[in-house]
């Protein structure tokens, strides 16, 4: 079955809209900043999607894309945003250009303004399943939301993640453990990958290789989350072979799959940051 990720994303955005109407009555309008310094088509597209959705939802936005030439410039800009009370949350658009260390950059992000959930505080609290406030990484948390809104019980399941990035794989470890799953993380050096995926209840693949995950690698009862993105002959495709859609029990589509949830979770995180800032219980 192909999972309807559009409906799941809309459920999250509908909750955002409802909360926003309540905030507006108190004259609170969320303000989000996006810092984009990488001049490439993919980053331009992703930022455009975020700005468009923000405009649709009625969120104030500020795009910062000029005057940042070095890593020190970016760190200074982050500190400005950290101390600007008019900004409720911000995003550092990744990937960064050569000469910028994203790990160093994320060390400077204020957890209370961290929409992407990539600051060191957010990541450590996520892995520790901390009760302290922290935004959860958007793509990883979106994947968990797909499973939950599909009425799929995560508890006790074996989840295999083919990705170890800070955006998908690493935060998913904490989120799956939080939901009482058993987790296996695979990567380019993993041996006997097929043996890992074949026994998995949940397979998350996000490596950017079209048709990488094939029928002989999964069991028919698996829930496949395809978070890979590639362009083939002008079309956006995922990492899962097309015939998996008729083979496995559940699978997310590409496009209109995990990406939809990533965008929706951006605004969920923004709302959570605003609620925390103003101590609003909506």
Swiss-Prot record:
Binding site for NADP(+): 163-165, 188, 229
UniProt xrefs under CDD domains: NAD_bind_m-THF_DH_Cyclohyd (cd01080)
Protein name, UniProt field: Bifunctional protein FolD
Function: Catalyzes the oxidation of 5,10-methylenetetrahydrofolate to 5,10-methenyltetrahydrofolate and then the hydrolysis of 5,10-methenyltetrahydrofolate to 10-formyltetrahydrofolate.
Gene3D superfamilies named in the record: Leucine Dehydrogenase, chain A, domain 1 (3.40.50.10860), NAD(P)-binding Rossmann-like Domain (3.40.50.720)
Signal peptide: none
Source organism (scientific name): Malacoplasma penetrans (strain HF-2)
One Pfam family of this chain: THF_DHG_CYH
Statement: the UniProt record of this protein carries the keyword Cell cycle: no
Cellular component GO terms held in the UniProt record: cytosol
Record text on subunit structure and interactions: Homodimer.
Domain of life: Bacteria
Involved pathway(s): One-carbon metabolism; tetrahydrofolate interconversion
Record EC number: 1.5.1.5, 3.5.4.9
Family, as annotated: Belongs to the tetrahydrofolate dehydrogenase/cyclohydrolase family.
Organism taxonomic ancestry: Bacteria, Bacillati, Mycoplasmatota, Mycoplasmoidales, Mycoplasmoidaceae
GO BP terms in the entry: L-histidine biosynthetic process; methionine biosynthetic process; purine nucleotide biosynthetic process; tetrahydrofolate interconversion
Catalytic activity: (6R)-5,10-methylene-5,6,7,8-tetrahydrofolate + NADP(+) = (6R)-5,10-methenyltetrahydrofolate + NADPH; (6R)-5,10-methenyltetrahydrofolate + H2O = (6R)-10-formyltetrahydrofolate + H(+)
GO molecular function annotation: methenyltetrahydrofolate cyclohydrolase activity; methylenetetrahydrofolate dehydrogenase (NADP+) activity
Keywords: Amino-acid biosynthesis, Histidine biosynthesis, Hydrolase, Methionine biosynthesis, Multifunctional enzyme, NADP, One-carbon metabolism, Oxidoreductase, Purine biosynthesis
């Amino acid at each position: 079955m192909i999972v309807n990720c559009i409906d799941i994303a809309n459920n999250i955005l509908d909750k955002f809209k409802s909360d926003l109407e309540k905030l507006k009555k108190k004259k609170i309008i969320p303000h989000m900043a996006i810092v984009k310094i990488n001049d490439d088509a993919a980053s331009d597209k992703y930022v455009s999607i975020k700005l468009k959705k923000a405009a649709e939802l009625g969120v104030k936005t500020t795009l910062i894309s000029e005057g940042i030439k070095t890593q020190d410039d970016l760190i200074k800009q982050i500190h400005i945003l950290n101390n600007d009370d008019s900004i409720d949350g911000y995003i550092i658009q990744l990937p960064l250009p050569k000469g910028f260390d994203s790990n160093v950059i994320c060390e400077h992000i204020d957890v209370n303004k961290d929409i992407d959930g990539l600051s060191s505080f957010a990541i450590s609290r996520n892995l520790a399943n901390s009760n302290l406030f922290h935004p959860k990484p958007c793509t990883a948390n979106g994947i968990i939301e797909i499973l939950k809104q599909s009425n799929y019980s995560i508890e006790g399941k074996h989840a295999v993640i083919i990705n170890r990035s800070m955006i998908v794989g690493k935060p998913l470890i904490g989120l799956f453990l939080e939901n009482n799953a058993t987790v296996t993380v695979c990567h380019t050096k993993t041996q006997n990958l097929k043996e890992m995926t074949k026994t998995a209840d949940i397979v998350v693949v996000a490596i950017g290789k079209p048709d990488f995950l094939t029928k002989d690698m999964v069991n028919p009862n698996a829930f496949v989350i395809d978070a890979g993105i590639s362009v083939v002959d002008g079309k956006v495709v995922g990492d899962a072979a097309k015939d998996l859609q008729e083979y496995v029990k559940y699978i997310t589509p590409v496009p209109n799959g995990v990406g939809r949830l990533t965008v929706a979770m951006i605004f969920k995180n923004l709302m959570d940051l605003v609620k925390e800032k103003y101590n609003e219980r909506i």
